[in-house]
Amino acid sequence: MKVYFFLILYVFLSFFSITYSKELEIDKIIAIVNNQIILNSDVNQVLFSLKEEDQRVKIPLKINFLRNKIIKKLITETLILEEAKKFNIVVTDDQVNNVLSKYALKKNITIEELKRNILMNNTNTSFSYNDYFNKIKNSLKVKIIQDYVLHNRVHISEKEVDLFLNKLINTQNELKKIDINCIFLPFIKEKNKIFIKNTKILADHFAKKIKKDASFNYYYEYFKKNNNIFLSKEIRSKSLKYLKKIFLNKLKIIKKNQILGPILGLKGFYILKINKIENENKENLTTEFHIQHCLIRPSVILDDKQAKNSIYYIYNNIKNKKYSFDYAVQKLSHDVYSSHKKGDLGWISTDFFSNDFRNFLTDLRKNEISKPIKSNFGWHIIKLLDIRQVDKSNRIDKNLVYRFLLEKKIKKERYNWIRQLKKSSYIKIFKN
């Protein structure tokens, strides 16, 4: 729905703010893009709408700046529309009417009221509803070809997602507060390499004994009360990031009651016991589902009813054994990211789903293939692989990581694509 809203908004901004000129002027050519021209009126359609939105753009220097930006935008759109023509991208009148209907519904008005608003708000007598209609059609073409080209040029591997996810998890873990008890073997003031080596041997031997006998607590309390070459020490509510400054190697803290060491620190060797890790309690447990899916997503060329019919057609074919679930995922699913790995979405938290969708998943048996169900993303056929409980305080959604990396790459690739189009085109901008 947001896509439709912004398409409509763009067209309104493009056409409804053309100011009257008391004298009829010849429309000037501002730029030539291959065999297409951009007129002064095209620029003004956008510029004057911006002036109405923000009076500050009346400053001449800012107007010149905006005009240049608008010209560049129009050049880019012209190039993309040429690519759409090469790919034979066709947008039908029904598709445009579908966009208009959804926009009118959002505004709680009828299509006829929308048409009247278009003509009433337009100050350009040469502009008609058909012009507005065609502008939306072009905007849809731009979106379709841009989505097609960029999603074919961009690929996010499983390895990239995992590397970024691990980096986020490690960063998050380093900020957790940790309570530690230490058995500490300090260095003497005049230490040398031989002394450090012998101290390490002693610490290693003692650590093995503690781990074998599970006697850390006994010795910790003993050294706390009695003077010895070993000392007891406690560290409270410190982050892993802080602890790494004290201990001169990486700490691989995994769980409560874990025994680590001996670990070299600034002042000696430490044997550690993890007493508490922040947020490690049952209240933070959440259910996660490991699922595969086949997705049919509504779009500007496939409305919700058509998407529903498609997913039920696929479901019936799977049920009647015309083809397998894996075949449907690989050949028919609209989810490009998961289709190449059998539709595997990995582990997804119950918090991610609506109540109806959550209840739907809960009722499934392991390895059961579901009937079609609708979500905000489209229509799904689900296969439940497994269920588990995890600590949600430290959970990072893998799908969100993928979407973040995808958007980042698409933004970069769009810049490269537009640059290539400009490089291979004839573009002439005329100065005023």
From Swiss-Prot:
InterPro entries: OMP_Chaperone_SurA, PPIase_dom_sf, PPIase_PpiC, PPIase_SurA, SurA_N, Trigger_fact/SurA_dom_sf
Entry GO CC: outer membrane-bounded periplasmic space
Entries under Pfam families matching the protein: Rotamase, SurA_N
Domain PpiC span(s) in chain numbering: 175-276, 286-386
Domain of life, per lineage: Bacteria
Keywords of the record: Chaperone, Isomerase, Periplasm, Repeat, Rotamase, Signal
Gene Ontology biological-process entries: Gram-negative-bacterium-type cell outer membrane assembly; protein folding; protein stabilization
Protein location: Periplasm
One GO MF term: peptide binding
Stretches assigned to coiled coil: none
Protein name (Swiss-Prot/TrEMBL): Chaperone SurA
Species of the source: Buchnera aphidicola subsp. Schizaphis graminum (strain Sg)
